[in-house]
Amino acid sequence: MLAGIGFYRRFISPLIGPRCRFTPTCSAYGLEAIQRHGPWKGGWLTVKRLLRCHPFTPCGCDPVPD
């Protein structure tokens, strides 16, 4: 999972530019969530975050929960 996020950050993100509506960015959120909560819970938190990141959601701070 972490390698997938790293690949996205290194190769895909520079091509499409900044698009995340939240702070921290979705990729940073994913890294932190997986590091803090492990691959299952952290991965699930990341998927939920990605589903919230769309033009109809207000922008703002959305930290990884404890």
Curated annotation (Swiss-Prot):
InterPro entries: Membr_insert_effic_factor_YidD (IPR002696). The keyword Cell inner membrane applies. It is a peripheral membrane protein. Its main location: membrane. It comes from the Bacteria. It is found in: Cell inner membrane. One of its GO terms (cellular component) is plasma membrane. Keywords: Cell inner membrane, Cell membrane, Membrane. SMART domains: Haemolytic. Belongs to the UPF0161 family. Could be involved in insertion of integral membrane proteins into the membrane. This is Putative membrane protein insertion efficiency factor. It comes from Parasynechococcus marenigrum (strain WH8102).
